[in-house]
Amino acid sequence: MGGKNKQRTKGNVRPSSSGRAAELLAKERGTVPGFIGFGTSQSDLGYVPAVQGAEEIDSLVDADFRMVLRKLSKRDIITKLKAMQEFGTMCKEREAEVVKGVLPYWPRIYCKISLDHDRRVREATQQSFEQLILKVKKHLAPYLKSIMGYWLIAQCDTYSPAASAAKEAFEKAFPSSKQPEALAFCKDEILNVLQDHLLKETPDTLSDPQTVPEEEREAKFFRILTCSLLALKKLLSMLPKKEMHSLEEKLMSLLSQNKFWKYGKHSTPQVRSAFFELASAFCQFLPELVKAEAPRVCPAVLLSIDDSDAVVCPALWEAVLHAIATIEDCWSHVNARKGVLPKLWTVLREGGRGLATVIYPNILPFISKVPPGITEPKLEYFRTFFSSIIQGLSNERALASPSESSAIITTFMECLRFAILQKIDEDEQRQIHQMLIYDQLIPLTDAVLQEPRLQNGPLFYQIAETLSSWEAKAEVSSDDNTNEVFQKLLSNFWDRLLKMCILHVDKLEADEKTLFAISDMLEVLQNPKTATKPNNRKSLKVKFSDEDESERNTENGKITEVRSNSDSEIQADLQHSSILRKEPLENLVCNLAELSIVYVNEQKSEQHLKFLSALLNFFSSNRVFQVLLEQGSNAGCPPAESQEDMKVHNENPSVQFLYMNLITWLKEDWRKDMHFLVDILYSVLNCCNSDDERKVILDDLTKMDLKWIVFLQIIQKACSSTTKLSLISEWLKGDMLGERLVMLADDLCHLGLKPIATSPESSSSEKWTVLSLVLSQHIKNESLIGETYVERIIDKLQAALSKAKDLSEAGNTEPSVSFICDVASSFFSSVKGCLLMPSSEDLLLTIFQLCAQRQDATHLTVDLLVCKLKHTWISGVNSLVRHLRSMQNQSTFLHKSALWIKNQIQSSSLDVKSLQVLISAVSDLLSTLLEADRQSGCLVGAYVEHVMPNRTEWETLRESLSAEWMHKPLLEGRLSMNCEHLGSCVKLCGTTKLPGHLCTSALLSKMVLLVLENDMVKGNEDAEILVAELLYSLQWIEELENPPYLLLEYLHMLEEMHITYEKFSALSNTTNLQQTIFDRSEEHGRLWSLTMAKVIRGENAVSREMTKLFKTSEGFLPLTEGRLHTLQCLSPFLIEEEKRELVFHCVAKLMTCTQTELSSTDGAFGCLAILNSSLNDKSFGCDHLLPGVLKIIISWKNDNEDSFLFSCNLKETSAQLLGFNIEMIRYLPLLLKYSTAPLADNEWDFIMCSMLAWLETTSENYSLYHVPLVQIFACVSCDLASALSAYFEPAAPKTTENLPVNLVSEWKEFFSEGIHNLLLPLFVKVTGETKTAAEGSFQNSVLTSLGEALTYISKDQLLNHKLPAKFVAGQKTNLPDNLQTLLNTLSPLLLFWARSVQVSVYHMLSKLMPELPKFDDEDLKSYGDEEEELALSPPAALMSVLATQELLLENILECIPVGEFAVIQPLSDEFCLVLGYLLTWKLTLTFFKAASSQLRVLYSQYLRRTKSLNKLLYHLFRLMPENPVFSGLTSEVPNKDTKTFFTEELHLDVKGTGALSSQIPHLACSVYHITLKDLPAMVRLWWNSCEKRVFNVVDKFTSKYVSSVLSSQEISSVQTSTQLFNGMTVKARSAAREVIATYSVDDIFIELIIQLPSNYPLGSITVESGKRVGVAVQQWRNWMLQLSTYLTHQNGSIMEGLSLWKNNVDKRFEGIEDCMICFSVIHGSNYSLPKKACRTCKKKFHSACLYKWFTSSNKSTCPLCRETFF
C-alpha cells in the first residue's frame, strides 16, 4: 500500500486503504473484528466493551456506523471532520434502534475526540452528539457518568461555536430544571476528570510526542487546563447547595495542592483568567472553604493586582473584590504597604495600562475596604492616591480614548467625595479638604480645561453633581458643624476656581479652546440637567424609506420643541438654584465678563468677544450687562446712536449695551463670523421687557446697513428654538422685514441677469439662503414672514426665470438660476399647500419650461443645473398633485404647461435634440402625475387631451408635410394620381427643423404609451389615433427618396425612446388601430393607403375587417381617389380569387367606358391603375383578358386620338390626361410580360408606333420635367422603350416564332434606331442642363429611365450617332472625328453627380473600348524603332477625366492609411466620385486588354510616367474591405465554397440600388482583379517599390483572396486555349499550379516547367528545366532566363509570354543572332529584332538596348569590341 505519506489530493473521494480493508472484511464475514484500543486515563478498552465477546457485540452495530467509527480514529483532520459530519447525518436519518447500537462505543470516542486539537472537529462532534441525543433520548443515561466530565469541559471550550454546540446538546438532553440534578448525579466522575486534567495530565500525556509537534501539544494542554478550570466553576455554579458539602473533601485535596495555586501565575493569560474566575466562584459558593485556605487565596489574588493583561483583568478584579469581601482578615495574609498598595499606585499612575474601563470602576469598592491602619497617615495616603490618578490621566493612552479618560475622571470624583466624607478629627479633616481642593480637584480641572481631548468628558458634570451634594449638606444645620465644614469647602472651591479662570482669561493671547471650555464648564455648573452627558450615547434609530413624508418634514419642529424645553429649564434652574451656587457663580461670571470686555474694548480681542458671547448666552442678566456697561463707559467707547435714542432705552442696561457696543461690532466689515454676536443680540432681547420693545430694536437693525448674514443667523437661530422664535416673531411678521426681503429678491434676480455680475458669490449665496429660509421654513403651518410678502417674492423669482429664458447673452444667469432653483425646491418640498398661490404655479411652469427646452435655447450649459431644475419642478408637481387630490381644485400649471407644449410641437420650430429634451421632460411630468394619481388617472387623461390637436389641427399638420413623398410611390406605380395640383413644382422638405406633425405624433405617442404601460384603460382611443398619426409620419419619411439627416436622426430618437408600433402592439390590441388606418385610407387615400400597406405587411395578414368591403365587386364603387389608392395598396395582399374578381370588374368597366370617362378616377384611368397594380405583383390566371384590354385601348385611339399624347406639347395638357396616358404606357410592358396569346400585326404596330410617339413627346417636353406628372410620363415612356428593347434583345427562336414575319427586322432597322436617335441626344441635353442633379432628386429619375433605355444601344448605333461635333483644342488623337466627338461628349459624364448617368455612360463606352486600339495600331506602323521609351496615351478624353478624378479623390482619401477600409456612404458626393473613378479605370483596362502586345507596352509606359496606376493601387487598398465576403457572409479563411467579391461577377444595373453599400467595395475588388490580370508586371513593379507596411498588407490580402482565383483562371485559360504553336505543346496542371511547355525542332527537344507562386502575380514566376536534348548548357540557361524575364516583365498572360519566347527561339534557329546586350532575339518591350550593327565586329543590337547602353555608360562605344559606334 504505497503512498501512505502522501497528501490526499482534491477530489480523491476513495476511502483510505485501511477503510477499504475494513469494508472488505465486513462484506466477507459480516462483522468487523474487535481491535483493542490503547489505554488512556480511563480503564475501558476503547470502543469495544471488554465485558462481552467482540464478535457477539459487533454484530449489533450497523455496517455503515462501523465504517464511520473506524474513520473517527484516523489521524487526518479532514477524514475525522467528514466522518463526524457523516456520523451526525446518519444519527439524524437512521432509525432509533440502529443508532442505539452505537451507544456502547460512543463514550470512549467522545471523550477523546471532544478534546481534539482542531476546532472544526470539536464543533462537529458536539453537533453530531446533539443528533445522537435527539435520536436515543433517555437511552443515553447508562453512559452519562463516563461522558459528563468531558461534556462539561466542552461547554467551556475556548472556541465559542464548539461551546455553544455543546450547551445546545446539553439543553436538548436535560431541561433547565433537571440540569443541576444531572450534574449532581455525575459529580464524582466529573471531579475525577477535572482533577486529573488539573493535577496529573501533561502536554505529553494528552498528545503523542512522536506524532504531534511540541507547539501543538502545549496549545492543547493549555486549552484543556483553561476549560477544566472553567468547567469546575460551572459545576460549582450549577450544583444544588445541598450537594456542595459532599464535594468539600475532594475540593480540599485540590486546594491543598501547590500546583493548583501556581495557575494564578501561569504564563498563559487564558489559564490565569480561568483561575481567577474559579477563585471568585469558590468565594461565592464555598466561603468557608476559602476562609480555611485564606493564607493561599489572599496572596494569590491580591498580589496579582498589577496584572495588565486584558484577558485576565476582569476576572482578577472580580476575584479581588470577592476575596476582600469574603475573607475578613484577608489583609493579615499580605503585606499591604509593601506588596499591594505600591502595585495599585503603579497601575493608577499608568492610567490602567489601557484597561481603565475595566479596572477603575473597582477602585472605590477596593479602597473602601482598606482598613484604617493601612491608610495612616491619611493625608499622605490620599495625596498619593489622588496624585496617582491625575498622573494616570495624563497618560497618552488614556487621553486618546474618551471612554478610558471618562472612567478615570469618574473614579477620581467618586473617590474624592468618599474621601471628603471620612470622619476624622477637625484639623486633619481641614488639611485633607484643603489638599483635595487646592492640590487635586482644581489642578485636575485646570488640566482638563487645557486639554481639548478631555473637555467633553464628564468632569464638569461630576463637579456640578458634587457641588450639589456639598450644597445640600451645607444648607442643613447639624450639631457636629457639618454644614460649616461644607460651607468652608464650597467657599474654598469657588475662590480657587475664580483665580484659576482669571489666570486663563486675563491674558491677551488667551487660548480660544480653553475659554470655550470655561464657558462650557460654567454652563454645566449653572444648569447640569440641560446638557446631555457625553458618556450617554445617542440612541441610534433605523429609519425606513416608506415613513410618512410629513414626519420627515416636521423634523425641524421636533428640534424646536426639544430646544424650547431646554430653554425653559434654564429659566427654572436660574430661579430655583441654590443661593450657595447662584451668588458665587454670578460673581465669577461678572468678573470674567468684566475682564473680557476690557480686552475687547482695548485690545480688540476676538476670542474674548466670543467668550463674552458664550457667557451672555447662559447668563443674560441685567447685572452682567450693568457690569459690562460700567466697564465700557470707563473705556470711553463711542455710542452707536444719538442721545435721543439712548434716552428712550436708558433704563435697560442690556439695550444700552446693544446700542453702545453690539451694533458697532455688527457693522465691522472685516468680520466674517457673526453667529456669536447674534447670540449676544438674543441675550439682549431676552432681557427686554416687552415684544414691542424687541420689535423696535429689530426694526432699527433692519433699517441699518447690516450684512445679510446677520439677519440670516437671527432667523436660523430662531428656527432652532421656539424661545428665540417667540422673541422675534413680531418682527418676522412685520412690514419692515417683509419689504426689505422683497427688495432683496428683486436685487438678487436683477443682479444675476446683468451681463457682468458685481456681487461676490459668497454674499450673494447668503442672501439667497435668507430668501430660501423665509420661504421654506414653516412653524405650526405658518410661514415665518407675512403671506403677502411670500407671494411677492415668488413673483420676483418667476419673473427672473422668464428673463433668463429670453436673454440671448446670458453667461451669468447660471448662478442666479441655480439659487432660484434651490429656493424654489426648498419652498415646494417643505411648505404645505404652497402651490395655492398663482405665483407659485407660474414659477413652477417657468422652471418646467426651462427644463423642457434645449440647453442652447435656454443658454444653460451646466448639466448639474439642468438636473437641479428637473428635481425642483418634479418636487413642485408632487406637492401640487397632493394638494389637488385633497382640495379637488383646478391647476393653472397643468393647463398652461399643456398649452405651451402643444404650441411648441405644432410650431415646426424644433430640431431633434429639442424634441428629445421636450419628450423627456413631458415623460417625467406624466410619470410624476401617474405615480401620484394612480387610482383615478383623471389628471393624466385630461392632460393628454389638452395637448392633443383637434381634427382640424391634425389636418393642418398633415398638409404642412411637403408633397415630396409622392414622387417615389408615383414613379414605382404603387399609387396613381391625376390631380391638378401635381401639375406644378413640388416643395422640398426642410433640413433644419422638424415638421410639426412629426413632433406632435412622437410626443403624444410617447404620452399614451406611458399611460398604457401603467395599465390605464383611459386613453386607449386616443392611443389608436396617435399611433396612426405616428405611423403616418414614419411612412412620410420612408417615402422620401433621400431623407435629410435630420429625419434619420428623428427615426433614431424614436427607437432610442421606444416610441414604436411594436411597443404599442405589445401593450394593446391593434385591431382597432388597423380599422382606423383603413378608414382613413378609404377616405383620404395617398399616404394613408401606403401606411395601411405597411401595417398589413408588418402583421403578415389582412384582417377580416380590412377585406370585408371586397367580398363583392360592387363594394368599392364608385371609385374615389381614396378607394383607388386603398385598392392599389391592398392588391398585393388579396387572395387570388379576390384579385381575379377585381380584374374582371376592371376589364368590364373598361369595355363600357365612354370617351368622357377615359381620364376620370371612376373611369378608365382608375380601372387601368388597379389593373396595373394587380399585375405588378404577379399573374393570376387572367392572361387571356390582357390582349382584350389592348384592343380596348386601340379602339380608344381610333375613336379619340386626342386623348393619346402623341408627339405633342404637354404645357397645356391636363393632369387627368397625363395620368391616363401614364397608366396606358404602364400597361404595355405588363402585357408583354404576362400575355401568353400572340399579338396581331396591327397590335404590334400600335405598340411600336405609340412607343415612338410617346418618346417624341418626352423628347420635345424636356423643359417641363420639373412637373411631377410630366416627369413620370417621361420615365414610363423610357421604361416602355427599355422593356421592348429587352424583349427583342435575345431574339431567341421561342420569342420570334410567334411574332409577325418582319417584326424583328423592323425593330432592328427602324424602331430601335428611332429610339436611340431620340434618346441619346435627349440624354446629352438633359445631363447638360442638370449638371448638379443629386441622386434621388426628381429630375434624376428621368435620367435613370433614359440611361436604362440607352444601355440597350448597339455599337453600330453609337458609331452612327447624330450628336453635334465636340473637339478639345490640343487633344492628341488617332480617332476619327465622329468617334472622338462621342468620347468627348460621353466621357465627362463619368464625373456627373448621379449614379444612373455614370453607369449608363459606362455601359455605352464599354461597347466602344475594344474598337479604339486599332486606330493606334495603324499609327504605330509609322513609328521607327530608333526612338527610346516611347509612350502612347489611352483615349485622351478618358485620361483627362481620370486626371480630374485623381485630384478630387486625393483630397478625400489621402488622410486614410493604405490598407484601412474607407466606408463610402451610398449616394453621397464621395460615392459618385469614387464610382466614376473606378468605372473610368474599368473602361481603361478594357481598352488596354483589347490592344495588341506592342501597343500595351506603349500604353503601360504612359501609365508609368503619369503614375496613374500607382495612385489607383493605393486607392484600391483603401476602398477594398479587409474581408471581401460576398452577400454578407463572414468567413475569415476563404475556402472553395466561400463567395468573395473576387469570385462573383459584378453586375452594374442602372436602376439596381439594392445593395449600394457593397457596390463600391465590390467594384474596387473587380478593378483590382482586372488590373492584376491584365497589368501584372506593372503591379509587381509598384508592389516592390512600396514601403514595408504597405508591402505586407498588399501581399497578405492578394495571397488570401486574389491569387487563388487568378491562378485557377490562368491555368484554365491555358487548358481551354485554342492557340496552336508549330512545334510546341502546352499543358496545365491546376492542382500544382504548373504549366508545362514542350518545344521540339529537328533533333532539339526542350521541356520547360512554369510554376506560379502562392501570391501570384506579385511573386516571381519560376521557370524550371525539364528534359532537354541537343541544346548547349549556356544557350539553355539563356532561354530559361528569357522566358522568366518575359513572364515577369510583360503585361500579359502565360500563353502570350510563351508565344513571345517561342518566336525568339524560332528566330534564333533561323539564324538571327541574339542582341549581345539583352541576350534575346526579340526585344522584351517593343518586340523588335536586332538591326543596329557595329561596323567593326559586325554584331547586331536592338535599337532600344543600344540607346540604354549609351545613356547609362555615357560612352558611344560598341558594348562588345569597345570601338566607336557609327
UniProtKB/Swiss-Prot annotation:
Its EC number is 2.3.2.27. One of its GO terms (cellular component) is cytosol. Residues 1-11 have a biased composition (Basic residues). A zinc finger (RING-type) spans 1715-1762. SMART domains: RINGv. One of its GO terms (molecular function) is ubiquitin protein ligase activity. Residues 551-566 have a biased composition (Basic and acidic residues). It catalyses: S-ubiquitinyl-[E2 ubiquitin-conjugating enzyme]-L-cysteine + [acceptor protein]-L-lysine = [E2 ubiquitin-conjugating enzyme]-L-cysteine + N(6)-ubiquitinyl-[acceptor protein]-L-lysine. InterPro entries: ARM-like, ARM-type_fold, LTN1/Rkr1, LTN1_E3_ligase_6th, LTN1_HEAT_5th, Ltn1_N, LTN1_UBC, RING-CH-C4HC3_LTN1. It comes from the Eukaryota. Residues 1-20, 529-567 are annotated as: Disordered. HEAT repeats lie at residues 100-138, 193-231, 292-329, 335-372, 512-549, 606-644, 672-710, 916-953, 1184-1227, 1314-1355, 1406-1447. Pathway: Protein modification; protein ubiquitination. One of its GO terms (biological process) is rescue of stalled ribosome. It is found in: Cytoplasm, Cytosol. Keywords: Cytoplasm, Metal-binding, Repeat, Transferase, Ubl conjugation pathway, Zinc, Zinc-finger. It holds the Pfam family Ltn1_1st. Belongs to the LTN1 family. Component of the ribosome quality control complex (RQC), composed of at least the E3 ubiquitin ligase LTN1 and NEMF associated with the 60S ribosomal subunit. The complex probably also contains TCF25 as well as VCP/p97 and its ubiquitin-binding cofactors. E3 ubiquitin-protein ligase component of the ribosome quality control complex (RQC), a ribosome-associated complex that mediates ubiquitination and extraction of incompletely synthesized nascent chains for proteasomal degradation. Within the RQC complex, LTN1 is recruited to stalled 60S ribosomal subunits by NEMF and mediates ubiquitination of stalled nascent chains. Ubiquitination leads to VCP/p97 recruitment for extraction and degradation of the incomplete translation product. This is E3 ubiquitin-protein ligase listerin. It comes from Gallus gallus (Chicken). The lineage of its organism: Eukaryota, Metazoa, Chordata, Craniata, Vertebrata. The gene is LTN1.
